[in-house]
Amino acid sequence: MKIYKLKDISEFIRNGVTIKQDISSKEGIPITRIETISKGTIDFNKLGYANISKIEKYKEWLLKKGDILISHINSEKHLGKSAIYLDNNYDIIHGMNLLCIRVIDKKVFPEYLQLFFKTNQYKKQIKKITKKSVNQASFSVNDFKEILITVPDLNIQEKIIKKIKVLEKILENNKLKLAYLSELTKSLFTRMFGDIKSNDKNWKIYKFSEKLKISSGGTPSKANKIYWENGTISWIGSNMCNDEIITKNDGKFITEEGLKNSSAKIYKMNTVIVALVGATIGKTGLLKFETSTNQNIAALEIKNMDYSPEFLFFLLQNLYYKFTELGGDTFKMANLNFIKNLPLISPPIELQNKFTERVEKIEKLKFIFDKALISNIFGKLYKKVSA
């Protein structure tokens, strides 16, 4: 058992090649982007393109089996996230804004290193080298090279990797269960409240503005440090709207001064939010903590006891088709008037509460199958080895 710095077990640790990517293109050899590893795996649907057909110029930047990509410029929540490349039959160019680490075979297996990148020991070291700015966080390549890792003999690493593969099968099975439970909630909503488009249960319809308080937030000036530095007030953007219950923010906070000197406002727990612009337009969130938001989010607060937050949250997801009908091929945008005029069906609150009870049961099951449970097992396995 030895302790190494990452630089001592690597052929290289480097940033990618600078290539101007064409967002409208899907032609040529794909290039990695920050989003490529956003889910902790190589997502082949989130690669960039620049119409590159000849590989000669970029041959040295092609990923090889066992290469690990690391996010070193991102929101604090995603900083240090990694993904391992295991497909030698698919050419991908390593683009900038992700680090790539290629290990020395005789010292460590890539799969063992990827296990380390899931542990609290690694995350604590990342936290120490993180430099925060207003928009994002980052760490330098040189600081990353100094991170310490406990490395057992190769035969022990091999045994650990076999255990990991068993755990990953469990994880994959859990993902399928999570997907099933998400679909179960959607079908439950339709069974209880009918098809929203046709209103086949003939519920009375109001406009959102008649029953809900609708507003948006704001962004304190990023040129003024006192609005951001050492902030304690949670502040989120539309990237957090992913049709999910939101239990914490992604690392951005503003100060009291920032709140006072901007349109930002604090929304209470159980406020339903929806993205007005960007890649997540029409996607929703149900807040489970107090937070302020930026101007790209509409917040829906219930005026009285006629509606449950959970019902409203899933109703909005069923109204996503309205957002797809907005004009603009490349950049769609909704505004508060659009939200205010959305149709709001009015089933009895007793039925809504029954739906909420069932949703809570499903959410508990989803928690049981959450991949974080497996990540904890990874961490315990590494801790046992490195003790």
Label each residue range with its predicted role:
Residues 19-27, 128-130, 201-204, 221-228, ...:
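Short coil/turn segments at secondary-structure boundaries
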Residues 131, 172, 326:
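Active-site region of PLP-dependent enzymes
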Residues 7-22, 35-68, 209-225, 239-269:
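Sequence-specific dsDNA recognition surfaces
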Residues 19, 90-99, 108-111, 131-155, ...:
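A short glycine-rich beta-alpha junction/loop motif
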Residues 1-16, 146-161, 177-187, 191-219, ...:
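Non-catalytic DNA-recognition/assembly elements of restriction-modification systems
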Residues 33-34, 55-118, 237-238, 251-317, ...:
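A short beta-sheet element
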Residues 122-127, 323:
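Periplasmic-binding protein-like
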